[in-house]
């Protein structure tokens, strides 16, 4: 199978794993895992970063007067749980070549992160799931996605959105006349304050000349379709 990239970093939101009333939805987990397995079996080298928003959000910490540092680490731990959920689903589907690398040492259930080891294992067909954020507070999973993408030599970051096909000049759910962008530069993201990712992540991607493709994952096989180049999306590159 011919894909538009050979190595990618897939950024998933935690919300992509949940249902209305449950933090995990079996069907959604299996759908994502099946697509990931198909891509890996067809030779794609794949790294994955998952958010933790289905379990923990910073606002919850604010509501109980928790210091941001503590709240950030709780968010990082939520990504560990999501990574383990995705790993177990992938393995249940019969694909055992998957590693979970954590920036926070949790030796019983994850591997300590080392980019050289991750690259070697990815060359052997292993899927790498990166959890625990950067390991430091005040940094988002967007920033972690860009850092890991650079470290594994990814051709691009695939940023999966829920129900939005790419980047608009305003919220399309609130503004029916919102303008959709097919192509943007990293500089335009910052200058126009477009809500794609945080400024730190956008700046890192710009400096590394790392393309970012934003797409809607809510559709049958949309992760595969974006890799095949058959899905409408927004591409951010210099």
UniProtKB/Swiss-Prot annotation:
Residues reported in the UniProt entry to bind UMP:
52, 72, 134-141
What regulation of activity is recorded for this protein? Inhibited by UTP.
Q: Where does ATP bind?
A: 11-14, 53, 57, 162, 168, 171
Q: To which protein family does this belong?
A: Belongs to the UMP kinase family.
Give the organism the record lists.
Mesoplasma florum (strain ATCC 33453 / NBRC 100688 / NCTC 11704 / L1)
Catalytic activities: UMP + ATP = UDP + ADP
Q: Which InterPro entries does the UniProt record give? A: AceGlu_kinase-like_sf, Asp/Glu/Uridylate_kinase, Uridylate_kinase, Uridylate_kinase_bac
Function comment = Catalyzes the reversible phosphorylation of UMP to UDP.
Q: Which UniProt keywords apply?
A: ATP-binding, Cytoplasm, Kinase, Nucleotide-binding, Pyrimidine biosynthesis, Transferase
Q: Which residues cross the membrane?
A: none
Name the Gene Ontology biological process terms: 'de novo' CTP biosynthetic process; UDP biosynthetic process
Record's superkingdom? Bacteria
**Would you indicate the residue range of the signal peptide?**
none
Keyword ATP-binding: yes or no?
yes
Under the heading Pfam families, the entry gives:
AA_kinase
Give the main location: cytoplasm
**Entry protein name:** Uridylate kinase
Can you state the subunit structure given in the record? Homohexamer.
* EC number, UniProt record: 2.7.4.22
Gene Ontology cellular component list: cytoplasm
Q: Which compartment or compartments is the protein found in? A: Cytoplasm
**Which molecular-function annotations from GO does this UniProt entry contain?**
ATP binding; UMP kinase activity
Asked whether the UniProt record includes Transmembrane among its keywords, one would answer: no
